[in-house]
Amino acid sequence: MTPAPEPQDPPTIHEPVATEQTDDISDWDVESDYEDGYGAPSKSQAQGGASAADRPKINAHARIDDQMTDLARHASKIRLDNLTMQQIFRDKDRTDNATSDQVLDNHTRMIILNMLNRNIISEIYGTISTGKEANVYNAVAYDNNGERIERAVKVYKTIILGFKDRERYLAGEQRFKTIVDKALSAPRKMIKLWAEKEFRNLKRLHTAGIPCPEPIYLKYNVMVMGFLGDHTNGYAFPRLHDTKITGETLEETEAEWRRLYINLLSMMRRMYQVCGLVHGDLSEYNILYNEGVLYIIDVSQSVEHDHIEATNFLRMDIRNVNDFFARRGVDTLSDRTVYHFITDSTGAVDENGMRKAIDNLYATRPPLAESEEARAEQEIDNQVFRNQFIPTTLEEVYNLEVELGKKVDTRLYQHMLADSKVPESTGGEHKSGEGGESGSEDEEGDEGESGEVESGDEEREEGEGDRFEKKRPRGKKHLDKAEKHAHKMAVKEAKREKRKEKMPKHVKKKLVAANKKRK
C-alpha cells in the first residue's frame, strides 16, 4: 500500500504593503505611466498556465522603488533655488521641507524625473515665480540639432493648497461636468483637473493667435510650456505692473499706453468670441510685456462664456483693466461700453476691424466734461454697472413688459436677443410688389395714410398665412405604400453594405482573447 503524499505548503503570495503611499500610487496609476510592458511574455506563458488564484501578485511598492532607483540618476538635473535635489531631500529644515511637501512630493518628483528620462526637458535650473497655486521654474530642452531651447515648467502645489476657491471656477464648467463632482471632494483630483483646465485654455488661446505661453506637455500636476523671456540669460519678461514706458515726450508715452489699452481690449474680445473664454483674473499682474507686445498668462481660472459666473468675471476683468490704464493717464472707455464691445457677436474679430470699432466708440461717445461733477457721475455709472444684475438666460428676465418698454440701448442683455427682423420663408410673393411697397411706406414714419397702413397689414397677414400653411406630418406611418417600400429596400441595402466590412466573429474572439492575456 503506497503511503499518502505529504501536504505541500501553498505558494507564497507577496502582498503589497498597505501603506498610504501605495494607495496613492495605485490611485494615480503610476505604473501605467512608466512601464508599459509591451512585448513581455504573458503570465500564463511564464507560469505554465497557472490559474489566476495561484499566480503571485505583483509587489507594486517594490516596483516603484526600483523605478525611483533607476530615475535617481537624473536628480542632479533638478536645481531649485540653487539647491540640488539631494540637498532638498536630506535637509531637515522646516522651510525646505515645506517647499518640498507643497511642490516636490514623491509623485511630482517622479513625474519630473520621468520627463528628464524621456528628454522632454533636459534640466531644471531656477525659479521664475512662486504663487499660491503653483510654482514656475526655468527648464532647458534640446532639439534634434542640439540647439538649446528654453522652457518653463509649472508645478501645481498638491499638499498645502493656498488657493482654496477653485470650486467657484470649476462648478458649472461644461467641459468637466462629468468629473467635477468627484474632483471637488478629492483635493488631488482637483489639482489634476485644474492643470488640465489651464492646458486646454492655453491651447485655445495659442490656436486663436493670442500671445501666450505655448502648451507643450502635461502630466498630472506638471505642465511644460514655452518660455516667455530672454533665451540668452533665462530672465522672464516683466509683468505689465512693473513695466515703465518712457517716450521722448509725454504725448508719446500717453500714446503708447493708449495703444496697449486698445490692444488689450481687442485680445479680450477675441478671447471671448473666438476662444469662448473669459479670463476671470485679468489684471496687470497676469500680463507680460515685451517690446510693445502683451502676453496673457495664468488662465487656469478662465471659464467659458456660458459659465454661470462668466458675466461677473468679465465685469471684474474690465474693472481691473480700466482702473490700471486710468492710473497710467489713459482716457478709458466706460465699463458698460467695453462690456458691449466684447460681447457683441456681430462685430469683427480681426485686428484692423476691432481697432476701427474701438476708434468709433471713442468718436461716438458723448463729450466728457472736465468738471469734478461730471467725473463723479461717470464713476457712479461704472459702480452701478459693476453691481447691476445682468441676466444670462431669458428665464431670468422677470418683468418682461417693463423690459420691452425700455430703450434698446439700455438693455444689458441685448446681445443675447435675436434681430428684430425675422427672416421670412423663401418664395413668398409678398416680398416684392405692392405688399413690399406698402410695408416700406409703413416703416418710414407717420406720414403715410391709414389706408396704406391697412393694406400693408393685410398683405403681411396673407404672407404669414402662406408661411404657416398645413404640411404633411413627419414619420414613416404617414408615408404611402410605395414610399414605405422604397425606404425599406434602402435600409436593407445599407445594412448589406455594412455587413461586407464587418469583422468575422472568429477573428474578433482571437483579438479579445489576446487583449485579455496582455492584461
From Swiss-Prot:
It comes from Chaetomium thermophilum (strain DSM 1495 / CBS 144.50 / IMI 039719) (Thermochaetoides thermophila). Residues 470-489, 497-519 have a biased composition (Basic residues). Belongs to the protein kinase superfamily. RIO-type Ser/Thr kinase family. One of its GO terms (molecular function) is protein serine/threonine kinase activity. This is Serine/threonine-protein kinase RIO1. Residues 39-53 have a biased composition (Low complexity). PANTHER family: SERINE/THREONINE-PROTEIN KINASE RIO1 (PTHR45723). Involved in the final steps of cytoplasmic maturation of the 40S ribosomal subunit. In vitro, has strong ATPase activity and only low protein kinase activity. The keyword Ribosomal protein does not apply. Residues 122-519 form the Protein kinase domain. It catalyses: L-seryl-[protein] + ATP = O-phospho-L-seryl-[protein] + ADP + H(+); L-threonyl-[protein] + ATP = O-phospho-L-threonyl-[protein] + ADP + H(+); ATP + H2O = ADP + phosphate + H(+). One of its GO terms (cellular component) is cytoplasm. Mg(2+) binds at residues 286, 298. It is found in: Cytoplasm. InterPro entries: Kinase-like_dom_sf (IPR011009), RIO-type_Ser/Thr_kinase (IPR051272), RIO_dom (IPR018934), RIO_kinase (IPR000687), RIO_kinase_CS (IPR018935), Ser/Thr_kinase_Rio1 (IPR017407), Tyr_kinase_AS (IPR008266). Keywords: ATP-binding, Cytoplasm, Hydrolase, Kinase, Magnesium, Metal-binding, Nucleotide-binding, Ribosome biogenesis, Serine/threonine-protein kinase, Transferase. GO terms for biological process: ribosome biogenesis. The active site is at residues 281, 298. ATP binds at residues 154, 228. Its EC number is 2.7.11.1, 3.6.1.-. Autophosphorylated. Residues 440-519 are annotated as: Association with (pre-)40S ribosomal particle.
